[in-house]
Amino acid sequence: MTVKICDCEGECCKDSCHCGSTCLPSCSGGEKCKCDHSTGSPQCKSCGEKCKCETTCTCEKSKCNCEKC
């Protein structure tokens, strides 16, 4: 089974995959895809706010600004 990286939208059961997540393509006949978050994705933990995987995150004045990929 090939592991692929999901696009931000549109790949691998839209409602199941997040931008940059690794996707195990088990999506057949309405099944949900099994997606795992990328371990190397930047998280804005120091700001106390979580960003979606593979977003660019900048912290200013304890606020987390996340940009979609």
Swiss-Prot record:
Keywords: Copper, Metal-binding, Metal-thiolate cluster. The lineage of its organism: Eukaryota, Fungi, Dikarya, Ascomycota, Saccharomycotina. Critical role in copper (specific) homeostasis and detoxification. May protect by directly chelating and sequestering copper ions. This is Metallothionein-like protein CRS5. The keyword Metal-binding applies. It holds the Pfam family Metallothi_Euk2. Belongs to the metallothionein superfamily. Type 13 family. InterPro entries: Crs5. One of its GO terms (biological process) is response to metal ion. The keyword Metal-binding applies. One of its GO terms (molecular function) is copper ion binding.
